[in-house]
Each structure stands twice: as structure tokens, then as C-alpha cells.
């Protein structure tokens, strides 16, 4: 018979530590209200630069209805790979996609900025020829996972790459124009780059085509971010025409807490993670809720408890002592066993050369993992409920992309529970998984932008306003 344990009685030192990770409803309400104030500042012309939730304009001001038709290209630019997609909208709720992943050689990624985009343009040209659409006029949208300063739908100034890219020559330049210039070297194809969006906006648009009430995109992976649909009248930093009433906003809420808004719930383990990170003092909200940080936080707690003799007292600590060694995949494996079973937890500890563990210690490990991920879900719920209440819509769908939501056995349940507790009960919502959908969203954006640009001509994309 499998053993079950009472944390308070069976591993009291662990229980005492985990109590530090249990925010109250009042705490979560306080976080929600602080988030709302920071969003209001982020949208403000006068206070934008002082906000930890800067609310960048996406310049996407149309939402799909599901009745649009046509074929388009998308380019997904991610830290580890790029993907080119041909997306066809042929009938209601029916999307056909054909794609090809391209791995950029390190010499190209580390070279001049123009080399990166020449490589991408060459890959796009080869792709459309392979798909026998090289004679077609193809609008293209870019889904971009790197930091941009957006100045228009089709103007995105590159602020920084991640560590996988070293092409410093592209920093400070317009990504869209760099790709347009590279594609101009292939006059035999007709590809029109219409704009650039981030991953969250892409996920939002992709789900919105199938579920037109979609108004939030939530990224729950190694990075933590969200986007939502705001009324243009609230977007004081927008200086364009206001005849379109909506704007997708990239919250960039990872930095929420950078000026102390979350200090009241931070504990010594949170502070250690922050101090030892590559960016101490910044991206505080992400350090509560990002997948990488959850695994690292568990590792810090376990190592501290091992040193005190509370758990795994006689086991080696050299492997688990390595920073970032316990990743989200391992964390999910630890909690995936049914109650009273610790097979997966032992398999994970085997990787750290911690073998033949006592069930009590493995139960404590699972309890720590559950505690850390539950708190992360609660804090994300504070942010999501803030967005829901700001929009004041009777029903919305929320596009969620990220392995922690999709694969963790309880994260989605906790997130749903606390979002319902925190949001105004008059507003209904539904979380919907949208795995790897940002390219489809970029294609939709390209289609809508093309339709708006060529309103007087024959449209490739049939819009329904």
C-alpha cells in the first residue's frame, strides 16, 4: 500500500518553509490592484516611462471573425529555430498549414545582421518554390520572440537578441525593412512583408479566428508575458487615427515588481534566486511565474533543506548544487505520479545521483514542487483577473501558450480557480491551449493588413467587419 504523508507532521521543516509560499486572497487582490495601476501608467503618455508594465502598442487594431479567406506566409523567429509557414484559410473554422523549420547556422546567427536576414529570405524563396506558390502574391507576417520597439505595424526596431544570436549589426534597425531588403534580391517571387507581432499577439489572433471572443494572449514558458485588447481611447501613447476602436497591447509584465510592488510577498528564497540570476533586480514577476525560475526556486529550497538535514540528509549535493540544473521538465515529472506514488520523483533524483531515497523525502520534494507552482499560478491569476476586469466584457477566451500550463497536472486548475476568485463574477472567461500557434496569428495579421492597405483593389483576404 502506497504511503501518504501529512506535511505538517511528517516533514515540519519543509512545511515551515513552504508556508512562506502561500499568499492570501488579500495578498493576491493587492497584487491585482498594483498591476492595474502599473498598466494605467504604462498606457499613459506622461507616466509610461516609469511603469513596470509598459504596455507596448502592437499596432494591431483589427480582430478576425473566422470568416476571412486566403493564403499567406508567416515567419516565426524564435531563439532556437525559425519556421516558415504557408497558411490557407479556405472555409469557416478550417485552417490548412504547411511549414518548414530552418536551423540557422551558428556562423550566420553570430555574423552581421544582414547575413541573418539574407539566410531567412533565401529560405523563404526556397520554401515558396517547393510549395509551388512562387507565382502568387503572398503577404507575410512575422512572429518575433525577441525584444522590439514597435513604431508601427510594419516597423519594429530590434532592441536585443537572446544569447543564441550574436548578430549585433541588426540591433537598432527595423526588422521588417531588413527582411524586405533581403527579399528584394529574389525578384522571381512576390512576398510582401506586412508587419511584425510578438508571440502573445500571434496566439491571441490565432485563437480569435476560431473563437471571436478571444481577448487575451498568455505566454507561460521560459518567459512570462501577456497581451490583451484595449480600447484605443485609453492608449494615450498612440498618436494615430482613432477610427479603429481597439488595440492589442503587449503588456510586457515580466518587469512588474521591479520597483518594489511585490516585495511584501518575496521571501529569502526568492531573493536568493534574484541575486544569483544574470539580471538581479529586474523581471521580478517573471521570477515568480516563469518556468525556468520555478525549477530553480525548487532547487534552491531543496539544497538549503539538504544542508540542514531536513531531507535527503545523507545524499550527495554536488549535482543538485549546480545552478539551473533542475528544469521545468524535471519539476513536471516529479509531480506527475498519483498520490502516494514516487516513481517519477525517484527517477528525477537519480539524475542528480541521489538514489534509493526514502518515500518521506520524495513526498517532501513533491510538496515543495506543488507549493512553488501553485504560488506561480496564483500570481498569474492576479494578472489575468486584472486584464479581465479592465475589459469589462461578459465573455472572453484566453489563448494560453506554454508547457507549464499544458503539461503540469494541476497548474491550469489552480490558475482557473484563483482567476475566478479574483475576477469580477459578472465576467466569464475560458482558458484555451494554443500550442505553437503564433505563426498562424502572424499570417492572420498579414491578411488583415493587406486587406486594409488595398481596400480599393481586389483583396486576397476577404474581411468581414
UniProtKB/Swiss-Prot annotation:
One of its GO terms (biological process) is glucose metabolic process. Residues 65-197 are annotated as: Hexokinase small subdomain. GO terms for cellular component: cytosol; mitochondrion. Its EC number is 2.7.1.1. SUPFAM superfamilies: Actin-like ATPase domain. Residues 8-447 form the Hexokinase domain. Pfam families: Hexokinase_1, Hexokinase_2. It catalyses: a D-hexose + ATP = a D-hexose 6-phosphate + ADP + H(+); D-mannose + ATP = D-mannose 6-phosphate + ADP + H(+); D-fructose + ATP = D-fructose 6-phosphate + ADP + H(+); D-glucose + ATP = D-glucose 6-phosphate + ADP + H(+). Belongs to the hexokinase family. Catalyzes the phosphorylation of various hexoses to hexose 6-phosphate. This is Hexokinase type 1. The lineage of its organism: Eukaryota, Metazoa, Ecdysozoa, Arthropoda, Hexapoda.
Amino acid at each position: 500500500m502506497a504511503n501518504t504523508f501529512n506535511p505538517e507532521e511528517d516533514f515540519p521543516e519543509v512545511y515551515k518553509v513552504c508556508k512562506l509560499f502561500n499568499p492570501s486572497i488579500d495578498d493576491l487582490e493587492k497584487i491585482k490592484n498594483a498591476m492595474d495601476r502599473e498598466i494605467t501608467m504604462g498606457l499613459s503618455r506622461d507616466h509610461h516611462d516609469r511603469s513596470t508594465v509598459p504596455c507596448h502598442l502592437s499596432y494591431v487594431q483589427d480582430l478576425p471573425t473566422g470568416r476571412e479567406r486566403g493564403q499567406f506566409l508567416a515567419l516565426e523567429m524564435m531563439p532556437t529555430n525559425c519556421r516558415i509557414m504557408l497558411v490557407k484559410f479556405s472555409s469557416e473554422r478550417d485552417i490548412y498549414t504547411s511549414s518548414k523549420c530552418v536551423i540557422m547556422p551558428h556562423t550566420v546567427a553570430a555574423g552581421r545582421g544582414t547575413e541573418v536576414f539574407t539566410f531567412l529570405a533565401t529560405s523563404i524563396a526556397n520554401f515558396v518554390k517547393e510549395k509551388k506558390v512562387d507565382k502568387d502574391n503572398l503577404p507575410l507576417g512575422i512572429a518575433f520572440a525577441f525584444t522590439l520597439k514597435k513604431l508601427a505595424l510594419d516597423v519594429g526596431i530590434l532592441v536585443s537578441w537572446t544569447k543564441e544570436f550574436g548578430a549585433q549589426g541588426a540591433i537598432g534597425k527595423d526588422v521588417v525593412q531588413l527582411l524586405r531588403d533581403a527579399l528584394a534580391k529574389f525578384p522571381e517571387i512576390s512576398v510582401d512583408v506586412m508587419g511584425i507581432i510578438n508571440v502573445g499577439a500571434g496566439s491571441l489572433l490565432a485563437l480569435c479566428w476560431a473563437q471571436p471572443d478571444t481577448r487575451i494572449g498568455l505566454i507561460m514558458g521560459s518567459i512570462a508575458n501577456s497581451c490583451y485588447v484595449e480600447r484605443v481611447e485609453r492608449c494615450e501613447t498612440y498618436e494615430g487615427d482613432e477610427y479603429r476602436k481597439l488595440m492589442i497591447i503587449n503588456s510586457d509584465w515580466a518587469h512588474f515588481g521591479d520597483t518594489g510592488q511585490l516585495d511584501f510577498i518575496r521571501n529569502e528564497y526568492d531573493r536568493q534566486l534574484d541575486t544569483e540570476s544574470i539580471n538581479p533586480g529586474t523581471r521580478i514577476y517573471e521570477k515568480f511565474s516563469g518556468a525556468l525560475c520555478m525549477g530553480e526556486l525548487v532547487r534552491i529550497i531543496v539544497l538549503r533543506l539538504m544542508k540542514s538535514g531536513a531531507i535527503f540528509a545523507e545524499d550527495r549535493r554536488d549535482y543538485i548544487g549546480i545552478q539551473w540544473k533542475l528544469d521545468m521538465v524535471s519539476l513536471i515529472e516529479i509531480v506527475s505520479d498519483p498520490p502516494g506514488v514516487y516513481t517519477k520523483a525517484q527517477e528525477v533524483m537519480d539524475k542528480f545521483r541521489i538514489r534509493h531515497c526514502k518515500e518521506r523525502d520524495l513526498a517532501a520534494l513533491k510538496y515543495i514542487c506543488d507549493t512553488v507552482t501553485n504560488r506561480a499560478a496564483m500570481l498569474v491569476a492576479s494578472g489575468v483577473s486584472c486584464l479581465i476586469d479592465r475589459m469589462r466584457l461578459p465573455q472572453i477566451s484566453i489563448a494560453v501558450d506554454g508547457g507549464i500550463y499544458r503539461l503540469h497536472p494541476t497548474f491550469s486548475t489552480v490558475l482557473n480557480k484563483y482567476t475566478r476568485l479574483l475576477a469580477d463574477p459578472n465576467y466569464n472567461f475560458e482558458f484555451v491551449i494554443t500550442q505553437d500557434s503564433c505563426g498562424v496569428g502572424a499570417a492572420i495579421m498579414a491578411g488583415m493588413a493587406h486587406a486594409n492597405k488595398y481596400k480599393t483593389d481586389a483583396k486576397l483576404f476577404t474581411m468581414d467587419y
